[in-house]
Amino acid sequence: MLSLAHALESQLRAAIDRAFPEAAASARESGTGLDPQLAPASKPEFGDFQANAALPLAKPLKQPPRQIAAAIVDQLMVDTAFNAICLTPDIAGPGFINLTVRPECLAAEVQARLADARLGVPLVEGDNDGQQPTPVVVDFSSPNIAKEMHVGHLRSTIIGDSLARVLEFRGHPVLRLNHVGDWGTQFGMLITHLKQVAPEALETADAVDLGDLVVFYRQAKQRFDDDEAFQTTSREEVVKLQGGDPLSLKAWSLLCDQSRREFQKIYDRLDVRLNERGESFYNAYLESVVEDLNVSGLLVSDDGAQCVFLEGVTGKDGKPLPVIVQKSDGGFNYATTDLAAMRYRFAAPPQGDGARRVIYVTDAGQANHFAGVFQVAQRAGWIPDAGRLQHVPFGLVQGEDGKKLKTRAGDTVRLRELLDEAVERAESDLRRRLQEEGRDEDESFIEQVATTVGLAAVKYADLSQNRITNYQFSFDRMLALQGNTAPYLLYAVVRIAGIARKGGDLDVTTAELQFSETQEWALVRELLKFDAVIAEVEEELLPNRLCTYLFELSQVFNRFYDQVPVLKAEQPSRSCRLALCRLTADTLKLGLSLLGIPTLERM
């Protein structure tokens, strides 16, 4: 109900101005204006919206809040536009103004959404000069080359993908960046190991199959730890790689390509799109980052290292903490690369991406790192006045014992194996249910449903949690058909598809929607919250808000369908209720798609 909320806010401001012209004029002079403090009603019995402006006005106006509220209501009642939207306002408690939207307005909103593929969600507007919206960068996933993706990459990948989907749906040009770890000293040992175990690949191959990358990495690391000569050669390889030695670059490229192929298999399964732009992309910009910081007067030499001391951030000794951008040996580090990336992403094309909002989706353990480099980038003047740098932190994935999720052997859980198990468990549950129901389905149906449900369960279990907190991973909970789970939401969509199979025309049109039952109005009001929820997710970057909404919508729909006849109802109620079924299905499908979850017609 965003459009109604905007109209009501405007009408409330005008009513307050008319009721208290002197206070309104004074507020305008101060550059603020009097805020009607309009918000969705906290409980259904309070109507649809609640305006709380009377309470903060009591002290400056030296009047009781209820008296102020009454004066505002008097002005609202002479506004024909307001009266066309709302019933007579109710003053509650110390001075809250409760607003209830007229039933015919709610019905008209439902009618409009039935004809709108965007379900009332507006596209973001461009700049005032008519330009298109500026790009938003979402930096997520970001695995390391020569290491297999593990459960720790799950959260960044699917949270980042969901946020990118919401931003894209709102109309923002989104640059989905995969800042893979494709550079660094570890490549010295990896290249040395590759040259020794597969030297022929460096002469002839455009691709190399190193088998299990995790095993390959461990072998290289073991040799590096145990063999002094291997260590020496590895360090020499780092120098060669940084110097552009063709053979070292070929080995590096082969390692990157194999990792890239393995990563893509995961991304394809999860239906995640990414543009790879690894750490190595910024190598050419690192020296100029240090030069810029020096010119701006931020750079300080400390024990041979070049660093920027942070403002307002001190260590245990009370001294400002540094962000090191060049080590004493002349080398660069993660902070240098991240600063180069920030500068590039905000720089105007063709020198950069021209973004005005850059979002980093990483684990909460990197919060201090990003706070530091964000401050440095701001002080260096690389962030435009309207630019927004945002870190989207998330907690750990834990086992049901509350500890970091591990295999029985104590190893990190590989993401590929976790997804495999989710699908296998979903298939087992499905086969058991089919047997109990006496249903005979072909193998292609079983494979499709198991794959969809298994992957959806993993995604939704993660996204439905507040990302800031740790969450406990449980296959049993996430695959349950009851509760706030993907199977529960998918089943609501399937249930509506079943109505159509039983002869209910979900595309039926009716000249005027009419509702009379409490359950109908509850569903109407829940459906009309969708646009506000999307706007909230876009701003606060919390996908769990969308999950909570979709779960509550499914609950309201199930109560409606269980308590009110649909197919057996008389006209015009039958058509009106079928319209609500269709809008519910459309809303669930669109909402789930923004979470990266496809739906099913049958389960």
UniProtKB/Swiss-Prot annotation:
Record has Glycosyltransferase as a keyword:
no
Domain of life the protein comes from: Bacteria
Where is it located?
Cytoplasm
SS bond partners: none
List the ranges annotated as motif 'HIGH' region. Answer: 143-153
Enzyme Commission number, as recorded: 6.1.1.19
Matching InterPro entries: aa-tRNA-synth_I_CS, Arg-tRNA-ligase, Arg-tRNA-synth_N, Arg-tRNA-synth_N_sf, ArgRS_core, DALR_anticod-bd, Rossmann-like_a/b/a_fold, tRNAsynth_Ia_anticodon-bd
Q: What molecular functions are annotated in GO for this chain?
A: arginine-tRNA ligase activity; ATP binding
Q: Which keywords accompany this UniProt record?
A: Aminoacyl-tRNA synthetase, ATP-binding, Cytoplasm, Ligase, Nucleotide-binding, Protein biosynthesis
**Catalytic reaction equation(s):** tRNA(Arg) + L-arginine + ATP = L-arginyl-tRNA(Arg) + AMP + diphosphate
**Residue span of the signal peptide, if any?**
none
Q: Read off the Pfam families from this record.
A: Arg_tRNA_synt_N, DALR_1, tRNA-synt_1d
Please list the GO biological process terms of this entry. Answer: arginyl-tRNA aminoacylation
Q: Name one GO cellular component term.
A: cytoplasm
Quaternary structure and interacting proteins, as annotated: Monomer.
Similarity comment text for this entry: Belongs to the class-I aminoacyl-tRNA synthetase family.
Q: What is the name listed in the Swiss-Prot or TrEMBL entry for this protein? A: Arginine--tRNA ligase
Organism, per UniProt? Prochlorococcus marinus (strain MIT 9303)
